[in-house]
Amino acid sequence: MNIEKYTERVRGFIQSAQTFALSSGNQQFTPEHILKVLIDDDEGLAASLVERAGGRVGDVRMGLQSALEKLPKVSGGNDQLYLSQPLAKVFSLAEELASKAGDSFVTVERLLTALAMEKSAKTSEILSAAGVTPTALNRVINDMRKGRTADSASAESNYDALKKYARDLTEDARAGKLDPVIGRDEEIRRTIQVLSRRTKNNPVLIGEPGVGKTAIAEGLALRIVNGDVPESLKDKQLMALDMGALIAGAKYRGEFEERLKAVLSEVQTAAGQIILFIDEMHTLVGAGKTDGAMDASNLLKPALARGELHCVGATTLEEYRKYVEKDAALARRFQPVFVDEPTVEDTISILRGLKEKYEQHHKVRVSDSALVAAATLSNRYITDRFLPDKAIDLVDEAASRLRMHVDSKPEELDEIDRRIMQLKIEREALKVETDAASKDRLQRIEKELSDLEEESAELTAKWQAEKQKLGLAADLKRQLEEARNALAIAQRNGEFQKAGELAYGTIPQLEKQLADAESQENKGSLLEETVTPDHVAQVISRWTGIPVDRMLEGEREKLLRMEDEIGKRVVGQGEAVQAISKAVRRARAGLQDPNRPIGSFIFLGPTGVGKTELTKALASFLFQDDTAMVRIDMSEFMEKHSVSRLIGAPPGYVGYEEGGVLTEAVRRRPYQVILFDEIEKAHPDVFNVLLQVLDDGRLTDGQGRTVDFRNTVIIMTSNLGAEYLVNLGENDDVETVRDDVMGVVRASFRPEFLNRVDEIILFHRLRREDMGAIVDIQMQRLQYLLSDRKITLQLEDDAREWLANKGYDPAYGARPLKRVIQKEVQDPLAERILLGDILDGSLVKITAGSDRLNFRPISGAFSAAEPEREDEKA
């Protein structure tokens, strides 16, 4: 016996059999030990051969059990194992059989045949008793081998290669496991057209991720099964190659190539009956490539060129360009079929086709309006992915979310159960009390508990009944789906009696039962049963960060009160607030180009008048969040080269992988206000980047990705022309100096930049009467800082006037007021809090003195008998 002549699998089995013999206490190594490990193998090649040869694996196991128990056992001896005479003959016969068949190595099936043929071995009797004959085994082996010989030590891994390394899509289609494919007729027709060619009949589906390339292959499988293909493709098998399984576990050099050759050999032997589908086709290029080895694509090329291999590939545009086009010899063997993203209307049709599958899986209903919302909202708000994939994901997640709520206890019932638990704890505590009040309270608790437990039982029964009803509807849908699949199979097989029973008996009956189950509407139902546009919008909100009420709240009321809302934060700039509100209303009413940003504005005015504050207020109004804003200080972009910081460095430069400040912020959160502060400080070339943002709502970053700006509000602030606005009289209209200001602006910015901005808004200097309102806003912010300490500030009218007068400076706007409040209010307050004069929870009255403010705590450690000290500290 030469162990080198045996395959790795057989060597492994011999080793396992020896270990098994020793652990069983046997000193003789017999054929029974070998058969035992062969039959118990996880991959089951021997067991599969026995079954295919007409044998009974269970009988083989029972016979082996009996034979092994009869073998002599030795305990406490040495670990010496002796080869029995029958086993030596089995090995010799196996080598002889392999040699006759032209094999270079002894394989599992040759060893199994030898175990069945060698009369001196007990295994021959066991296999014979189980119905296995050497003749039947040889027939099955020849069927499996398909004329191939075992030329390598890993020969067994190449048997039934297609079954191991590919998935039969046509079989899945027959079993009804594939989702229906709606539309895409043109692409499927083009694919069939290429497949019907004589040579180079290999289409490759090229399109963006998520547009439905794999679905087209599944659509082709469904058409083949339904016979909806030309004669040349009738009864073909479409097999999806699993590159992961093909590469996994290929440890030794040349093993991967062997597996792939085995797959190709099976496809070629099928004489054109098998079409291979390779998803992510770019993985072929370089797959299995090691020193001196060929990669998968080179192994495929000859068969592809001769037309022996029918192949459908699928890959994305990016990967096709990066991997396949570089290999011109591979690219020319494939015929590209471009798959475009479907329109919103097509996506709605696709969702309607898939609706039943998702309803059946999640056991909830999906309304048609939810499908329309999923298609339209995903198209509008999820810009970095493609239809129909993103819309399908939305429906899937919305249904999953609803199902989670259905399975959880309803809020109403949960509150009652928590109250019952609370009352039970209180009842146990009161039972030990003897006073009259406690007894009276105990009686009231018993009464309330009785009522609540009754209500809880009713609600629980109602909840369970509703869940059961939902489950019944889902069960009927599943039965209906199975009946439809059975009808399709019966029609294909020509079983017309069965088809008639299903079509005119079972299916109409199930449809009626389902309609009855769904028509029973529950008034005041505890459970939501249907996915609505609201659920879809909530998922969008989770994905993108847009508050859901921004889309679903009646926006008319919200937009009509926009001036009032923003006016609470921005004082004295009525014209600016009105102008920006009108622009946003125009955009929301759909009267503005949807391919441009929501609005783009330049705010011009002196310092401290509220330009940046208006931007923050706008972000808070539109997105309910002050931080939904990217602030870019243009003073940092004074050099020409600094533009790369906005959009990312070009290839070959340091920082290429990092992306740009502007583009990355908008890619991560596409819905926000973008503030370019002090734009006149930036280099003029920086504005060239903004031209396409303002015009088309898009910008290409350093890595070639298109970033969508259609849902942003772009605001630029500047001090240009501020001298004209500062010198304006308190009651003068800003429009009187607009021409002068615009003259300065035009001298600084190019016409094509200014021409793309929606509106240039002028801010006038703050008036004296505006200062009181600004004092209140600033004091509210200070009050917020003190809220942790529960200290309340009460600012008297005289103190407000005092602060407004002291902080008013027409040239510098509201900023001097902030400094005055810091010096006259915050500093004394901080000192008093640290001294312990003002305690947590105090009310502090602030009044005006002659040259300072006075602080009087109403409650706390500060003594009313020490007014002199209070004034000193002020």
From Swiss-Prot:
Keywords: ATP-binding, Chaperone, Coiled coil, Cytoplasm, Nucleotide-binding, Repeat, Stress response. Residues 83-147 are annotated as: Repeat 2. This is Chaperone protein ClpB. It is found in: Cytoplasm. Residues 555-765 are annotated as: NBD2. ATP 2 binds at G605, P606, T607, G608, V609, G610, K611, T612. Part of a stress-induced multi-chaperone system, it is involved in the recovery of the cell from heat-induced damage, in cooperation with DnaK, DnaJ and GrpE. Acts before DnaK, in the processing of protein aggregates. Protein binding stimulates the ATPase activity; ATP hydrolysis unfolds the denatured protein aggregates, which probably helps expose new hydrophobic binding sites on the surface of ClpB-bound aggregates, contributing to the solubilization and refolding of denatured protein aggregates by DnaK. Residues 3-147 form the Clp R domain. GO terms for molecular function: ATP binding; ATP hydrolysis activity. Residues 392-524 form a coiled coil. Homohexamer. The oligomerization is ATP-dependent. It comes from Brucella suis biovar 1 (strain 1330). Residues 6-71 are annotated as: Repeat 1. ATP 1 binds at G207, E208, P209, G210, V211, G212, K213, T214. GO terms for biological process: cellular response to heat; protein refolding. Residues 766-874 are annotated as: C-terminal. Pfam families: AAA (PF00004), AAA_2 (PF07724), AAA_lid_9 (PF17871), Clp_N (PF02861), ClpB_D2-small (PF10431). Residues 160-341 are annotated as: NBD1. Induction: By heat and acid shock. The lineage of its organism: Bacteria, Pseudomonadati, Pseudomonadota, Alphaproteobacteria, Hyphomicrobiales. Residues 342-545 are annotated as: Linker. PANTHER family: ATP-DEPENDENT CLP PROTEASE, HEAT SHOCK PROTEIN 104. Belongs to the ClpA/ClpB family.
